[in-house]
């Protein structure tokens, strides 16, 4: 269990004070994958560096497995950092060392005997899919392979928490998915708690159980990923979801001809089993209305499927529209009116 209570990080310069993290409260379940998403400058990198005290909070508490990180002695903090490991966007490998020796490095620092360290490193090489590349140097590896080395090195001391600081930002989409699949596998095998920060909603949707959205140092929205994805509340969250859907439809709306009287353009959001039910056709028949599908999309989250439909209803009375909306709610389908004639 990880808890952040009223965490603040303030930087003081000669001319001004910068509030990088502003009274953040988080509760992260042990064994879960928790994502923090935000645009550049949102404060997410500063936030994650306070989990292992690479940055000390100005105020507030960071508690991991019952330990108040800011209250640990130097030796206690050093021991805790072995259990709260981290991987980085640019890998941070030692270029003069082979794959195997990069993975052995934290074990050497921890004083593990060489034979045991080598055996552990070989096991990790296999776990991350690099068997046969033990003697390769970082310059001989692809970006995805370098990150696999970074992950193996981070696991060397059997951590309980893995922090991922934009770990896939430097990778192409296919390699990103491969690294995300590896993180899922490792979480399941080792019961890790994973906290990752990213600016990509795809990463959140693909592997996270819960998400916090940051802007200007504040957490502006948080909750289960499927819930946040299907029903975003804050403007920033809506933008992330829209970008993930590659949705330019609202821009196109401004170019459409004015709607006829009593016509509607609506967006429906389906989740779980409702994504495969013939709801639109049954409602079209029930209310004897024509429905044009202007746009359709479906996205998978770690815990379910979310579908999106944009519909044009050429004519429906306000009374029938109210019934139409009520029936959608009863079927657990969310509706947003985009335009009304």
Curated annotation (Swiss-Prot):
Keywords: Amino-acid transport, ATP-binding, Cell membrane, Membrane, Nucleotide-binding, Translocase, Transport. SUPFAM superfamilies: ACT-like, P-loop containing nucleoside triphosphate hydrolases. One of its GO terms (molecular function) is ATP binding. Residues 2-241 form the ABC transporter domain. Coiled coil: none annotated. It is a peripheral membrane protein. It is an enzyme of class 7 (translocase). Gene3D superfamilies: 3.30.70.260, P-loop containing nucleotide triphosphate hydrolases. This is Methionine import ATP-binding protein MetN 2. The lineage of its organism: Bacteria, Bacillati, Bacillota, Bacilli, Bacillales. The gene is metN2.
